[in-house]
UniProtKB/Swiss-Prot annotation:
<dbReference type="InterPro" id="IPR009060">
    <property type="entry name" value="UBA-like_sf"/>
</dbReference>
<feature type="region of interest" description="Involved in Mg(2+) ion dislocation from EF-Tu">
    <location>
        <begin position="80"/>
        <end position="83"/>
    </location>
</feature>
<dbReference type="InterPro" id="IPR014039">
    <property type="entry name" value="Transl_elong_EFTs/EF1B_dimer"/>
</dbReference>
<dbReference type="GO" id="GO:0005737">
    <property type="term" value="C:cytoplasm"/>
</dbReference>
<dbReference type="Pfam" id="PF00889">
    <property type="entry name" value="EF_TS"/>
</dbReference>
<comment type="function">
    <text>Associates with the EF-Tu.GDP complex and induces the exchange of GDP to GTP. It remains bound to the aminoacyl-tRNA.EF-Tu.GTP complex up to the GTP hydrolysis stage on the ribosome.</text>
</comment>
<dbReference type="GO" id="GO:0003746">
    <property type="term" value="F:translation elongation factor activity"/>
</dbReference>
<keyword id="KW-0963">Cytoplasm</keyword>
<keyword id="KW-0648">Protein biosynthesis</keyword>
<comment type="similarity">
    <text>Belongs to the EF-Ts family.</text>
</comment>
<dbReference type="InterPro" id="IPR018101">
    <property type="entry name" value="Transl_elong_Ts_CS"/>
</dbReference>
<dbReference type="InterPro" id="IPR036402">
    <property type="entry name" value="EF-Ts_dimer_sf"/>
</dbReference>
<keyword id="KW-0251">Elongation factor</keyword>
<dbReference type="InterPro" id="IPR001816">
    <property type="entry name" value="Transl_elong_EFTs/EF1B"/>
</dbReference>
<protein>
    <recommendedName>
        <fullName>Elongation factor Ts</fullName>
    </recommendedName>
</protein>
Length: 293
């Protein structure tokens, strides 16, 4: 049996993108013949998985999972929407979400190294799925949130996971109300919970922009200041969830709606599949609003 050197393993890894242990096993099985080792990895589907690493995966699913006082929202990408509807892929997404909650991993990199109940790492599980499904798959991001027994999580998925929202409502255990607010956030896409989260820098910048707009419109200087403050309030309403008219009842704000339930929105995370990545243009927020009419 040939001696498998680290240099040979490194060369095979470079050619196939497969993991170190997979490469070492392939070389051992093929008596150190690198060409046969490549074929071995291809036959096992491992090299096939590695070759897909340079493809763009901008489709996929967002999923929300809760366990007691912990919740996670996760986005896992695929190359096509067809695969995102695949039952096996959907099960993988749920499996990864539960793994995040069980391990409390802080980064995607750390998550990939964690061990699943079956003894395999998340990285190995993803590669197996790539080989089975035939597309590049990747864990893009996740966020963990916690609450107390007196609070509620709200989870909402649009179109089965094209948009996902996780809300944390303090002071109320009404999960339906928390979900309704999550639905609102999916539709309206606010940037912040409240104006308290908006930096002075952003407010001052917007105030200056609005002032110049008013002056350019030829408004008298003596009313510009009052006009700017009015427009600034409208701007903050557009970006802050609690100040927005509630989509299910526009006669009240989100804050007022939750107050009737004894609760207060303290946090939310909103993911849209592929946002910020190169993909076809679709406005899912407008679609959510359309379904509520």
């Amino acid at each position: 049996m040939a001696t498998i050197s680290a240099k040979l393993v490194k060369e095979l890894r470079k050619k196939t993108g497969a993991g170190m242990m997979d490469c070492k096993k392939a070389l051992t099985e093929t008596d150190g013949d690198i060409d046969k080792a490549i074929d071995y990895l291809r036959e096992k589907g491992i090299a096939k998985a590695a070759k897909k690493a340079d493809r763009i995966a901008a489709e996929g699913l967002v999923h929300v999972e809760t366990k007691g006082n912990d919740a996670v929202i996760v986005e896992i990408n695929s190359e096509t929407d067809f695969v995102a509807r695949n039952e096996g892929f959907q099960e993988l997404v749920k499996e990864i979400a539960n793994q995040v909650l069980d391990t409390k991993a802080e980064t995607v990199e750390a998550l990939m190294e964690t061990t699943l109940p079956n003894g395999k790492s998340v990285d190995e599980r993803i590669k197996e799925a790539i080989s089975t499904i035939g597309e590049k798959l990747s864990v893009r991001r996740f966020a963990i949130r916690t609450k107390t027994d007196n609070d509620a999580f709200g989870a909402y998925l649009h179109m089965g996971g094209r948009i996902g929202v996780l809300t944390v409502v303090e002071g109320s255990t009404d999960e339906e109300a928390a979900r309704d607010v999550a639905m609102h956030i999916a539709a309206i896409n606010p940037k912040y919970v409240s104006s308290e989260q908006v930096s002075e820098e952003e407010i001052n910048h917007e105030r200056e922009v609005l002032k110049q707009q008013a002056l350019n419109e030829g408004k008298p200087e003596n009313i510009v200041e009052k006009m700017v403050e009015g427009r600034l309030r409208k701007y903050l309403q557009e970006i802050c969830a609690v100040d927005q008219d509630f989509v299910k009842n526009p006669d009240v704000t989100v804050e007022a709606f939750l107050k009737t339930k004894g609760g207060k929105l303290v946090d939310f995370v909103r993911y849209e599949v592929g946002e910020g990545m190169e993909k076809r243009e679709e406005n899912f927020a407008d679609e959510v609003k359309g379904q509520m009419k």
